Amino acid sequence: MSHPSTLVLIPARMAATRLPGKPLLDIAGLPMIVHVLRRAEAADVGPVAVATDTAEIAAAVEAHGGRVVMTRADHPSGSDRVAEALGVLDPDGRIEIVVNLQGDFPTIRPDNIGAVLGPLADPAVDIATLCAEIHTEEEATNPNVVKVIGSPLSPARLRALYFTRATAPWGEGPRYHHIGLYAYRRAALQRFIALPPSALEQREKLEQLRALEAGMRIDVGIVDTVPRGVDTAADLETARRILSSRN
């Protein structure tokens, strides 16, 4: 169900080094960014727009009926781009929650986008995100898989204590793979982008640690599966296979 106080923003840029022009790469007849747009629209949680500094991305999105906000090219992170776009689209401050959906998640399930809003039902939560349980040792030990260490609040939710590329926590019990989808309260997003990069953020190369080090609360919804991001040529072929089979 759409929420008038919620906005979904998809930051997109052409600067990927491993897959040049990534947002516009063809997957089953559509640019990747359009697949992400369609998933966000299907989630039906609120209006959707793509935030970009690139005319080619804007043209592709608009050609498929999507809304675009042009942003500056010098943003240090997707969160900063999202904050600028939010200010352009909603200068009067009516939007209370903004979802930051990465533009390289063409196979994300719409219900995952809805699920990220769940933790924000608790007014004490500043930022919400998602995770899924890790089931293989390869995933547990892979430094490219970010793990959530959290205190269980319910069978479907954690309060985040830390995020790491290491294999953690120690001992028996579940480990969780972080999914890079965020929902921010508007005030939390503005506070976050005003903070300087933190020591642990720079060490782990994980932006969300800046919020934890500043005392902000991040809660994490637990979902069944991790959506496949597209970072490599192999990821791209996997996404093409998945989405071609759906058509």
Swiss-Prot record:
> What does the UniProt entry say about where the protein is found?
Cytoplasm
InterPro entries of this UniProt entry? Cytidylyl_trans (IPR003329), KdsB (IPR004528), Nucleotide-diphossugar_trans (IPR029044)
The keyword Cytoplasm is annotated on this UniProt entry: yes
Please give the CDD domains that the UniProt record associates with this protein. CMP-KDO-Synthetase
Q: Does the keyword Transferase apply?
A: yes
Judging by the UniProt lineage, the source's domain of life is Bacteria
Give the record's pathway.
Answer: Nucleotide-sugar biosynthesis; CMP-3-deoxy-D-manno-octulosonate biosynthesis; CMP-3-deoxy-D-manno-octulosonate from 3-deoxy-D-manno-octulosonate and CTP: step 1/1; Bacterial outer membrane biogenesis; lipopolysaccharide biosynthesis
User: What's the top EC group for this one?
Assistant: transferase
Catalytic reactions on record: 3-deoxy-alpha-D-manno-oct-2-ulosonate + CTP = CMP-3-deoxy-beta-D-manno-octulosonate + diphosphate
Q: What is its EC number?
A: 2.7.7.38
Q: Biological process (GO) annotations?
A: CMP-keto-3-deoxy-D-manno-octulosonic acid biosynthetic process; lipopolysaccharide biosynthetic process
Keywords of this protein's UniProt record, alphabetized? Cytoplasm, Lipopolysaccharide biosynthesis, Nucleotidyltransferase, Transferase
Q: Which SUPFAM superfamilies match?
A: Nucleotide-diphospho-sugar transferases
Q: Which GO terms describe its molecular function?
A: 3-deoxy-manno-octulosonate cytidylyltransferase activity
Q: Which GO terms describe its cellular component?
A: cytosol
Enumerate the HAMAP family for this protein. Answer: KdsB
Q: What role is this protein assigned?
A: Activates KDO (a required 8-carbon sugar) for incorporation into bacterial lipopolysaccharide in Gram-negative bacteria.
Recorded family membership: Belongs to the KdsB family.
Specify the protein name.
3-deoxy-manno-octulosonate cytidylyltransferase
User: Which species expresses this protein natively?
Assistant: Rhodopseudomonas palustris (strain BisA53)
